């Protein structure tokens, strides 16, 4: 009973004034940890499970179309029967795309239940367990216990805050993993599974228009329209599991949010992860997180020459 009261009191203090200290970690440590997360991402797609059709290069200054076909010419949909993918896809209809509209789109009970199931699985996954143990070993306050870690992951990613009109209309998860409409354009949406689902649902009126940057089957920045609204360059990691993206992005957010990028490397290809926080009512939320391509290297080309 005493331990329960202590835990509740800790969460009460956290809820009242949320300030996450800067994390003193070197670039080499982040690089090594990112590669470790990739190694344990056993739910990511194998190279033979995804085939991309990038088609034409395009630019961000207009809405020109350099792609007549879909981006994904092949995806082994057995991937989507894995629990994290299935639970993620179940969450996709919970959100109002337009900013300024109060969330959730479904009942609060349904949202709480589906988010809870997703977090239950993700927090027990290998990438998130590795991340928790790493933070705990380094004494980060987000990982003093599994309960505190869950609180912060839920707060940073799923708690609602306002992006427009002062209404609780968004969350870090919605922005990064789902996508939003603001000021007549698409904002956020940095996940390959979401891209694939929208591209293969005719009712979404989704049109891929070409790439601005591509790094084989690892990462790309893509132009598209969604129900007539333009996204000039939306960047995604390709083939990664939902739990990997959440673990990597959480690590980078807590370590390098703001002006610094989180520099990582996958399959020989350098990438940067950019992240921003939003503070409202003394609480901290994920504002945005997205990958960008680093300089193309001979190692990147050599390791991915068959992709």
UniProtKB/Swiss-Prot annotation:
Hey, what's the signal peptide range on this chain?
Answer: 1-17
CC terms in the record's Gene Ontology section: extracellular region
Listed name of the protein: Endoribonuclease endu-1
* Name of one Pfam family that matches: XendoU
- Taxonomic source organism: Caenorhabditis elegans
The subcellular location is:
Secreted
Molecular function via GO? lyase activity; metal ion binding; RNA binding; RNA endonuclease activity
Q: Which cofactor does it need?
A: Mn(2+)
Catalyses: a ribonucleotidyl-ribonucleotide-RNA = a 3'-end 2',3'-cyclophospho-ribonucleotide-RNA + a 5'-end dephospho-ribonucleoside-RNA
InterPro entries named in the record: ENDOU, EndoU-like, EndoU_C
EndoU domain residues? 26-295
- Name the job this protein performs: Catalyzes RNA cleavage releasing a product with a 2',3'-cyclic phosphate at the 3'-end.
- Which protein family is it in? Belongs to the ENDOU family.
């Amino acid at each position: 009973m005493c331990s329960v009261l202590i835990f509740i009191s800790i969460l009460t203090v956290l809820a009242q004034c949320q300030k996450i200290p800067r994390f003193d970690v070197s670039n080499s440590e982040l690089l090594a940890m990112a590669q470790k997360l990739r190694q344990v991402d056993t739910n990511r797609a194998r190279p033979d499970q995804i085939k991309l059709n990038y088609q034409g290069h395009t630019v961000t200054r207009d809405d020109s179309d350099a792609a007549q076909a879909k981006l994904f010419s092949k995806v082994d949909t057995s991937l989507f029967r894995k629990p994290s993918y299935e639970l993620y896809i179940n969450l996709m209809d919970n959100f109002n795309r337009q900013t300024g509209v109060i969330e959730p789109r479904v009942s609060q009970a349904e949202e709480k239940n589906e988010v809870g199931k997703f977090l239950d699985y993700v927090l027990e996954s290998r990438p998130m367990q590795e991340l928790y143990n790493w933070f705990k070993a380094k004494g980060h306050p987000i990982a003093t216990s599994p309960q505190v870690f869950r609180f912060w992951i839920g707060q940073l990613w799923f708690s609602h805050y306002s992006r427009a009109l002062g209404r609780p209309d968004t969350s870090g998860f919605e922005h990064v993993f789902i996508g939003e409409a603001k000021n007549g354009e698409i904002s956020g949406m940095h996940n390959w599974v979401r891209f694939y689902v929208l591209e293969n649902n005719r009712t979404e009126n989704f049109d891929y228009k070409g790439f601005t940057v591509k790094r084989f089957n690892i990462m790309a920045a893509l132009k598209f329209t969604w129900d007539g609204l333009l996204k000039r360059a939306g960047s995604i990691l390709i083939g990664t599991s939902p739990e990997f993206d959440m673990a990597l992005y959480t690590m980078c957010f807590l370590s390098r949010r703001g002006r610094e990028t989180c520099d990582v490397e996958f399959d020989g290809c350098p990438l940067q992860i950019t992240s921003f926080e939003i503070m409202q009512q003394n609480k901290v939320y994920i504002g945005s997180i997205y990958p960008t391509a680093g300089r193309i290297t001979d190692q990147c080309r050599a390791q991915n020459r068959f992709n």
